[in-house]
Structures are given as structure tokens and as C-alpha cells.
């Protein structure tokens, strides 16, 4: 068949064989280099391409492929393998290539009709058949909610989207790689394999945050089956790296809505008129939810995300909260660090968590009232620890409390009004942190630099100044 000829031709295609260039400061093992070579050969080389267009001429060098990969993920583009690049390569992900020229098809494809069929060919032993059925149906509904598309299930015969579970070589000349690594792949709209969606049955699929959530993986893959490429937006469902998200309240991100509606247009049954957008760090109107330092690194929280700002970094890195801590909620209210204890505290609603480094401490979350707050208190707006006094200020609405970290009790005489003790910063605080004898209070798009010793505002800055804007 023509597919067999194509696959035979691919066996003679270029394969990475030159050594992978590496950063001199990185301590990489031979296994790391082998992983990187395999990753680039699989996801950034046309020789890995099971279907579509062959590109035998002007095959890019390994250094160029590394640069492409680093650029796609927003890393520092060096063309050399380093720890940050390797960390991305080690994360579980979709098996579809990231860059268009290496993708299954050379141009945008879409289904020529809005009424599509799907069939679940077989099942994973990890879940009951009803759990798989529900996850697949819900994953397709993510896309039909925002488009005119309709999906009808077939029990027999050939459907537009054939859903199956398989291991290693599973019939499409694009084998899976065992546990972790590549979780699934899907083919864009078209005949034969077009639309078909395959899941690696060496993975442990689940309906929660254990293993890999089938709904999350399937919703991503169906994006490919409908014609979408990977997105560079880390908040997008079509970002190639797997991140668990709460499925009960899942709303398709705006980036994905925009992409799918370019292909099929909007629908008229969207239950979520507002779709979450990825924050822009240099937005002049940017406000933040929380800020803290963690072992010298600033962590600035906004919606589902946080920015990492390290003294040695030239730019802020945007990361999903769930990609670091699947156990945490999608949004935080407040955060602060107690450096002497090597602990950071994160707050949401009436609960709070403690971090030692990046690890959540056992026996957390705990309740706010365990710190002495009244049980009627619903949330903390901001928190900041003053290392000179050993006190932590907790801000809520127009008031604040003082907490003695040594005694682990609230100080008497509180709460007090923010406007009386910190005049000029406004009647509420969104976030706060301390640095070099100053408290920094964030209120909407502004931050106020407040001298602890003179007890006055010394500078007013834009909130995005903390993100090097």
C-alpha cells in the first residue's frame, strides 16, 4: 500500500547520530543524552513522521532542533542541552510533534462536515467500561460546546474518530514507548487513519489525579483529531506536556476556543461564556493573587499560574500551579515564606498548605482557625512575614492581623484597619512580600514600596515591575 511504501521510505530517512551538544555547566549522564537524542528524533525530526510529507532535504542539525524545542517551550535558546531543557524532555506528554514542519500533515486540515462519529474500539483495564465511555464523551463535549460540531457514537463499523488503547507497536507504525513518556497520539482529519486517537495502554489511566487522567489526555488528543496543532501557551489544553486539572469544573481555555473556532466557527450552546485566559506578565493592568519568596526565588501567583523569577534568570517563567502541585487548588489567595524554618505557606479559602522546598509538608492542608482566626473568617487576602520582628501580617478585606510565629498565636489588639497603620496603600491588599527592609504591598495594578523603619511609602510602582517589565 502507499502507506507501506511511505514507511519503507522513512526507514532510510535521516536519524540523529551526532552527539547532542550540552551546556558545560550541566552534569548530564549518558542516559540523559540518549533521552534527548530520542526525544528530538521522535518529535523534532521528519524521520519520525508516520504519515504525511517527507522532508529529506536541508535536515536541521541537532543544535537547530534543540533551539526549536527550547523556543517552543519558552526556554533560553542556546542550542545546548541543559537541566531546564532536560526537565521538559522528561515530562509526560502527547506523542504528536510540536513544530508544524514535523507534524503529521503539512497544512491545516478540518472535517468537511459538522456531524461526526466516534467509536471506542477497545478498553483499558485501568477503568470500567462506563468510566471510559463517560471520559471520552465528556472530552468530545469540550469541543462541541464551543463549535457547531456534533458527535454520535457508533458501536460497530468505521467511525470518523476511532478510539483505541494499545501498547508499543499497535498498527500505525508509530509505536508507543512504555510507561510515562508519550501518553497518546491522534491523527488530523482525513481518510483512513484520519481522526483516529490512540492511547498508550502501558500508562495508568484514571478519573482523578492519580496516574494520567483519561479525560484530560483525551480532550487534548481530540483537539488534534479535529485539526489543531500544539500550542505554545502553557495554559492551553493543546500545550503538549500533560498537566492534571480539576475535571469537574473544567472550562476550555480561551486559546483553545480561538483555535478551534478558526476551523469550525462558534457554536450557540456554550455553557461557559467566559473562558480562562493566560495572563500576560507585562499587561499594564496586571493584578496578582499572591507572592512569596522560596529559597531566593520569587513566586508570583495569578489565576491558575505562577511566575518563577530567579536572580539568575533573564526572564520570568510562567508555570501552571497544577504542574508543580496537583494537590493544590487552581487558584491561591495568599502566600508567605518563613526562611528560618525553610517553610512557605500557601492559602486558599479556609485552608492552607506548607511547603518545604517544593514538597508539600505532611499533615497539610490545615484550617485557618488552627492559627487562631475565628471560624467565620472565609479567606486571607495577603500575608507577609517580617523577619526582623518575627511577626506575620495577615490581610483580609480592610483589616489586618498580626501573628507571632514563635508563639504561634495571634497578637492582642487585632484586627486593625489597614488604612490607619499603612496610610496610602489603599483599603485592601492583594499580595505582599518583604525585601531589604521594605514591605511591598500590591493593590490592583499598583505596588507600594513601604519602609518598615520610616513607616511611609517610598515608591509607587506598577505591579508588573516585579516581573521585570
From Swiss-Prot:
Hemopexin repeats lie at residues 279-328, 329-375, 377-425, 426-469. SMART domains: HX, ZnMc. GO terms for biological process: bone morphogenesis; collagen catabolic process; extracellular matrix disassembly; extracellular matrix organization; proteolysis. Ca(2+) 4 binds at residues 289, 333, 430. The proenzyme is activated by removal of the propeptide; this cleavage can be effected by other matrix metalloproteinases and may involve several cleavage steps. Cleavage can also be autocatalytic, after partial maturation by another protease or after treatment with 4-aminophenylmercuric acetate (APMA) (in vitro). Zn(2+) 2 binds at residues 94, 220, 224, 230, 238. Residues 266-469 are annotated as: Interaction with collagen. InterPro entries: Hemopexin-like_dom, Hemopexin-like_dom_sf, Hemopexin-like_repeat, Hemopexin_CS, M10A_MMP, MetalloPept_cat_dom_sf, Pept_M10_metallopeptidase, Pept_M10A. Residues 18-100 form a propeptide. GO terms for cellular component: extracellular matrix; extracellular space. Its EC number is 3.4.24.-. Ca(2+) 2 binds at residues 160, 194, 196. It comes from the Eukaryota. Disulfide bonds join 282-469. Glycans are attached at residues 115, 150. PANTHER family: COLLAGENASE 3, MATRIX METALLOPROTEINASE. Belongs to the peptidase M10A family. The Xenopus genome contains two genes coding for very similar enzymes: MMP-13 and MMP-13A. The C-terminal region binds to collagen. This is Collagenase 3. It comes from Xenopus laevis.
Amino acid at each position: 500500500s502507499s502507506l507501506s511504501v511511505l514507511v519503507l521510505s522513512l526507514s532510510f530517512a535521516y536519524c540523529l547520530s551526532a552527539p547532542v551538544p550540552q551546556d558545560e555547566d550541566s552534569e548530564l549522564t549518558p542516559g540523559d543524552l540518549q533521552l534527548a537524542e530520542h526525544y528530538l528524533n521522535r518529535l523534532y525530526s521528519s524521520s519520525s513522521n508516520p504519515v504525511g510529507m517527507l522532508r529529506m532535504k536541508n535536515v536541521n542539525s541537532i543544535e537547530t532542533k534543540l533551539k526549536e524545542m527550547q523556543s517552543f517551550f519558552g526556554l533560553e535558546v542556546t542550542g545546548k542541552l541543559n537541566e531546564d531543557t532536560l526537565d521538559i524532555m522528561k515530562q509526560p506528554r502527547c506523542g504528536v510533534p510540536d513544530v508544524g514542519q514535523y507534524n503529521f500533515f503539512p497544512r491545516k486540515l478540518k472535517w468537511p462536515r459538522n456531524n461526526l462519529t466516534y467509536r471506542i474500539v477497545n478498553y483499558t483495564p485501568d477503568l470500567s467500561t462506563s468510566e471510559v465511555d463517560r471520559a471520552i464523551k465528556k472530552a468530545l463535549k469540550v469541543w462541541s460546546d464551543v463549535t457547531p460540531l456534533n458527535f454520535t457514537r457508533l458501536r460497530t463499523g468505521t467511525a470518523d474518530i476511532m478510539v483505541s488503547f494499545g501498547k508499543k507497536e499497535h498498527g500505525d507504525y508509530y509505536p508507543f514507548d512504555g510507561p510515562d513518556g508519550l501518553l497518546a497520539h491522534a491523527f488530523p482529519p482525513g481518510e483512513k487513519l484520519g481522526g483516529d486517537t490512540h492511547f498508550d495502554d502501558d500508562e495508568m489511566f484514571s478519573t482523578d489525579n492519580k496516574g494520567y487522567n483519561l479525560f484530560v489526555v483525551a480532550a487534548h488528543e481530540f483537539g488534534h483529531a479535529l485539526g489543531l496543532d500544539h500550542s505554545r501557551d502553557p495554559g492551553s489544553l493543546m500545550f503538549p506536556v500533560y498537566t492534571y486539572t480539576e475535571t469537574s469544573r473544567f472550562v476550555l481555555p480561551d486559546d483553545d476556543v480561538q483555535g478551534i473556532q478558526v476551523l469550525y466557527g462558534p457554536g450557540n450552546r456554550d455553557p461557559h461564556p467566559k473562558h480562562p485566559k493566560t495572563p500576560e506578565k507585562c499587561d499594564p493592568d496586571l493584578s496578582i493573587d499572591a507572592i512569596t519568596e522560596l529559597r531566593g526565588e520569587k513566586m508570583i501567583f495569578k489565576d491558575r499560574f505562577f511566575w518563577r523569577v530567579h536572580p539568575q534568570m533573564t526572564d520570568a517563567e510562567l508555570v501552571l500551579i497544577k504542574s508543580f502541585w496537583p494537590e493544590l487548588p487552581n487558584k491561591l489567595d495568599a502566600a508567605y515564606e518563613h526562611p528560618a524554618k525553610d517553610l512557605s505557606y500557601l492559602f486558599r479559602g479556609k485552608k492552607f498548605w506548607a511547603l518545604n522546598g517544593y514538597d508539600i509538608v505532611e499533615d497539610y492542608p490545615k484550617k485557618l482557625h488552627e492559627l487562631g482566626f475565628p471560624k467565620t473568617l472565609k479567606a486571607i487576602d495577603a500575608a507577609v512575614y517580617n523577619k526582623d520582628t518575627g511577626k506575620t501580617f495577615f490581610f483580609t478585606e480592610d483589616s489586618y492581623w498580626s501573628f507571632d510565629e514563635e508563639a504561634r498565636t495571634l497578637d492582642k489588639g487585632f484586627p486593625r484597619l489597614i488604612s490607619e497603620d499603612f496610610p496610602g496603600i489603599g483599603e485592601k491588599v492583594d499580595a505582599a512580600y518583604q525585601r531589604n527592609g521594605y514591605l511591598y504591598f500590591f493593590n490592583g495594578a499598583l505596588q507600594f514600596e513601604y519602609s518598615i523603619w520610616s513607616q511611609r511609602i517610598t515608591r509607587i510602582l506598577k505591579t508588573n515591575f516585579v516581573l521585570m517589565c
